[in-house]
């Protein structure tokens, strides 16, 4: 079974409320969703995953420092990196409109792209991934589920059908 690792941190609990609906969507497609707070993530966890989702609060238009640090430390591994060819995505919760939530998602996706992950855009909703302003609404939580399911379908297409690039030391 393919596995997606959801790495998250939450400041006021709002990003944390989005984690389970994303995981539910992933599981609804028959893909394992492994959820870990950023402080518990190891390199082995990341290598074992076929996809990686970042869940971060909006911090002045950027991901939380713990997320940034984790991916900075992975960069030390050199090229090609251990995450190349995996599928990546992100979601965030901000404090209010104009707080930088869209920039936070772009920052997260930029980090994932720099590590060689494959990113899928969203043509009909928030283009870069789920966004909540303060506490996630029912509409946002529903989008988290549908986004997680859509994202899991991409992982299945690329990984389970052997279309994703082979990664030395990875699972595919």
Model-based region annotation:
Residues 14-18, 34, 45:
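Amphipathic alpha-helical hairpins
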Residues 2-27:
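N-terminal beta1-alpha1 ligand-phosphate binding loop
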Residues 4, 33, 119:
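Hydrophobic anchor at the start of a short beta-strand
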Residues 7-9, 36, 91:
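Short hydrophobic segments within beta-strands
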Residues 39-124:
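Helix-loop-strand module that forms the ligand-binding subsite of alpha/beta enzymes
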Residues 27, 31, 75-79, 113-118, ...:
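Generic secondary-structure signature for well-ordered alpha-helical cores
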Residues 31-41:
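A short beta-strand-loop structural module common to alpha/beta enzyme folds
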Residues 118-172:
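Glycine-rich phosphate/pyrophosphate-binding loop and the adjoining helix
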């Amino acid at each position: 079974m393919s596995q997606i690792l959801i790495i998250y941190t939450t400041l006021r609990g709002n990003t944390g409320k989005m984690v389970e609906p994303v995981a539910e969507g992933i599981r609804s497609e028959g893909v394992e969703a492994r959820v870990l707070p950023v402080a518990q993530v190891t390199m082995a966890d990341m290598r074992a995953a076929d996809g990686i989702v970042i869940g971060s609060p909006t911090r002045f238009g950027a991901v939380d420092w713990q997320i940034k640090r984790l991916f900075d430390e992975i960069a030390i591994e050199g090229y090609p990196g251990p995450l190349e060819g995996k599928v990546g995505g992100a979601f965030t919760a901000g404090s209010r409109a104009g707080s930088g939530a869209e920039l936070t998602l772009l920052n997260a996706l930029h980090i994932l792209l720099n590590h060689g992950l494959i990113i899928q855009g969203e043509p009909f909703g928030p283009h870069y991934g789920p966004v909540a302003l303060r506490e996630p609404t029912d509409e946002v939580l529903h989008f988290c589920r549908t986004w997680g399911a859509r994202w899991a379908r991409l992982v299945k297409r690329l990984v389970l059908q052997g279309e994703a690039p082979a990664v030395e030391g990875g699972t595919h």
